[in-house]
Amino acid sequence: MTNSKNRFGNKFIGAHVSAAGGVDNAPLRAREIGANAFALFTKNQRQWVAKPLEEKTISAFKANCALLGFSPQQILPHDSYLINLGAPEAEKLEKSRLAFIDEMERCQLLGLNLLNFHPGSHLEKISEKACLYLIAESINLAHQAVPDVVAVIENTAGQGSNLGWRFEHLAEIIEQVEDKSRVGVCLDTCHTFAAGYDLRTPEACEATFAEFERVVGMHYLRAMHINDSKVKLASKVDRHHALGKGEIGWDCFEYIAKDSRFDSIPLILETIEPELWPQEIEQLRKYHLSSIA
């Protein structure tokens, strides 16, 4: 049952907002769209190196989050797209690992404890097994370098040589991570669907999440990306769409909004029409609140 203090219910619903002009602007942009969760890049996602966060920016970010009621468990930083923690070439792997540690350090400075990342790609040069081992080893090295921050592996659509599209890939990485309290999964609905796991009906959702529980374990689910898909089931192509406009449809998103297994984790829109985010957030919240009234 919600009360006036908890008008959002038990769901953390938001979107990946811009940090242009400074990361301290991200919580303001999230609240403008009615969100009580958000994702952000803590640096330019298409550059290897960024200048360190300034103390005044860190303080302003923390102050804005406190003012607007965003706790660390409602915020999902995303790392750079350049990083490949399973890179087959030693130089690229080392560069990726150093960049990932830097991303974790930035999270720590901002008082955040989750870091969402794409697992990695073998580039057709090493085996899947070798690549998954390198990804796990990269996480272990980052854990040794930076305390507290949880490495949140995002499942992928299966494009090219990217790993992480099968639940078994995620399980194999986690199995090789030493500190399992600091590793988790972010399930992207578009990626899940594109990889071949059906989400179009409540029954399909039930089966897919039962499979995730069997192979990985729901206790590892630390976040979700809520996206419809422009492409058909098992297409292995990553093309996000606005909710209800794609191949998945609203039944899936209503299912997630009403199911308590997805409470208290960031549920982040990365849909392609940001002008629709306020309506998408409002609709998801309506579904959620109707289920707990």
Curated annotation (Swiss-Prot):
What Enzyme Commission number does this protein have? 3.1.21.2
* Residues that coordinate or bind Zn(2+) 3: 191, 238, 240
Q: Which cofactor does it need?
A: Zn(2+)
Which InterPro entries does this entry report, sorted A to Z?
AP_endonuc_2, AP_endonuc_F2_Zn_BS, Xyl_isomerase-like_sf, Xyl_isomerase-like_TIM-brl
Keyword annotations: DNA damage, DNA repair, Endonuclease, Hydrolase, Metal-binding, Nuclease, Zinc
What does it catalyze?
Answer: Endonucleolytic cleavage to 5'-phosphooligonucleotide end-products
How many cofactors are bound and how? Answer: Binds 3 Zn(2+) ions.
Any one GO MF term held by the record is:
DNA-(apurinic or apyrimidinic site) endonuclease activity
The biological processes this protein is annotated with in GO are:
base-excision repair
Query: Which residues participate in Zn(2+) 2 binding?
Result: 154, 188, 225, 270
Q: Does the keyword DNA damage apply?
A: yes
Q: Extract the CDD domains matched here.
A: AP2Ec
Which positions does UniProt annotate for Zn(2+) 1 binding? Answer: 78, 118, 154
Pfam families attached here?
AP_endonuc_2 (PF01261)
Biological function: Endonuclease IV plays a role in DNA repair. It cleaves phosphodiester bonds at apurinic or apyrimidinic (AP) sites, generating a 3'-hydroxyl group and a 5'-terminal sugar phosphate.
**Family indicated by similarity:** Belongs to the AP endonuclease 2 family.
Protein name, as recorded: Probable endonuclease 4
Taxonomic placement: Bacteria, Pseudomonadati, Pseudomonadota, Gammaproteobacteria, Vibrionales
